[in-house]
Amino acid sequence: MKIVHVTECLAGGVLTFLVNLTSQLDQEEHIIIYGKRDNTPENVETLFGDNVSLIYWKSAQREIRPGQDFAALRELLHDLKQIPDIDVLQLHSSKAGVLGRVAARLLGLQKRTFYLPHGVSFARQDVSPKKRQFYILIEKVANAFAGTVIACSSSERDLLTANGIKNVVVINNGIAVPDKEPVYKQPGKPIVFGTVGRITFQKNPQLFNQIARHFQGDDRVKFLWIGDGELRHEIQESGQVQVTGWVTPDEVQNYLKQVDVYLSTSLWEGLPLSVLEAMALGKPLLLSDCVGNVDTVEQGANGFLYHDAAEGIASIQKLLKASPDKILQLGKTSYKRVANDFSLRRLRQQYRALYNII
């Protein structure tokens, strides 16, 4: 089977997903037509196996610019025409999703086309309501051109269908989950509440800081942000709050092992890989109740969802009063949940079944 992937941003979560998917479906031929971002690794092709080839999409860019977008569509059409016998066309992220579905319609590939948003554009809270309505309109038009939409979580599917997007299926994001359970860590003194990610508006560092400041001077608790970003200044570092700065993937794992409870303050997600990685390490979850986050928490069984700072603070106070055995049990349930519902093995099975429908 020949699978062609198209993305304007071969970086971050899209890159991780494609590395995982192409390695899981290693008997298939994959061709990736890609655009670059500032955080696209040098020699990105070395991250993929021998079953993958890459084509650089030089006109691709994130922002809506009609002239540049027309050039990107023309280049994409040219590249797709050079690839014989395409079995599956899979589009990743919003811009590739729009241009790719137009191209699919023009080339007669609409029934072989799948679109994976990696986070729905109109879920964004960093744009005006008017712009969100514009994004919904664009998605509806593109949806009519071609293909099936793949939501990476049930809550993302619900958001899509509630806004008039049709022909949506769910395949949960997945990660490599070790067959052997992790060594569960007794919560320390202080208990470390930590998160992983770029410090951006989406991740809501203001809320993270607000929660942390409530516990200022309380030596029972510490807060850790693993990562860096343009809004680092919104997190007030102190003896209680540490920001690691940019670290390697191996260092991320080492820091994450030090965390007792994974804390997310995100405003929106698709289905966050960092949360799944924390679950695979047996971490209890304390997550904001946004799209994507809500799919990972079984309330009271592997952690808690909260709506605002007051609820988040109350949940931390509850965890501080809980016995170490209770916190360990929350972590064990996290591992079982990720192993059952969010593994690469399950993702591979579901994608194979989806592609075989064609």
PLM segments and residue spans:
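Conserved acidic donor-binding segment of nucleotide-sugar-dependent glycosyltransferases
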Residues: 299-300, 304-310, 318-324
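N-terminal strand-loop element at the rim of the active site
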Residues: 5-68, 159-161, 229-231
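Aromatic "clamp/platform" in nucleotide-sugar-dependent glycosyltransferases that forms part
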Residues: 267
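Short hydrophobic beta-strand element within catalytic cores of glycosyltransferases
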Residues: 284-287
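Nucleotide-sugar donor phosphate/pyrophosphate-binding loop at the beta->alpha transition
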Residues: 70-74, 112, 122-141, 145, ...
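Conserved donor-binding/catalytic core segment of Leloir-type glycosyltransferases
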Residues: 4, 186-203, 209-213
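Donor nucleotide-sugar binding/catalytic pocket of nucleotide-sugar-dependent glycosyltransferases
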Residues: 55-56, 140-181
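Nucleotide-activated donor-binding/catalytic signature segment of Leloir-type glycosyltransferases, i.e.
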Residues: 234-250
